[in-house]
């Protein structure tokens, strides 16, 4: 069984026991989170349920396995011939989740 969930403004396709990295979610390691914004749910051999915009009664349960930071990206702005340069870096904080269960009532 698989589902498409919305987390942190992005969409993720998840299976049971899959591991995903999403934008930071506050919580301690080992705590469980439920996603009720399920956009689609289905099985590979049967037709899927597509939400309008979400599937009612569908819940995805996940466990926080790690809190980490992504690789650093460099943002560099420049205007030619004007001696204008700006350099900034950014490291996005991420949460690693293990999908435990996908249910639809």
Swiss-Prot record:
GO terms for molecular function: rRNA binding; structural constituent of ribosome. Keywords: Ribonucleoprotein, Ribosomal protein, RNA-binding, rRNA-binding. PROSITE patterns: RIBOSOMAL_L21. GO terms for biological process: translation. This protein binds to 23S rRNA in the presence of protein L20. Part of the 50S ribosomal subunit. Contacts protein L20. Belongs to the bacterial ribosomal protein bL21 family. This is Large ribosomal subunit protein bL21. It comes from Rickettsia peacockii (strain Rustic). The lineage of its organism: Bacteria, Pseudomonadati, Pseudomonadota, Alphaproteobacteria, Rickettsiales.
């Amino acid at each position: 069984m698989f589902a498409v969930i919305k987390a942190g403004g992005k969409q993720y396709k998840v299976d049971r026991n899959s591991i995903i990295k999403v934008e930071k979610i506050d919580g301690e390691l080992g705590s469980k989170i439920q996603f009720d914004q399920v956009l689609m749910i289905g099985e590979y051999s049967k037709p899927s349920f597509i939400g309008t915009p979400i599937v009612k009664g569908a819940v995805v349960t996940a466990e926080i396995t790690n809190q980490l930071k992504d690789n650093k990206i460099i943002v560099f702005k420049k205007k030619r011939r004007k001696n204008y340069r700006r350099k900034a870096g950014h490291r996005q904080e991420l949460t690693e989740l293990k999908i435990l269960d996908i249910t639809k009532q």
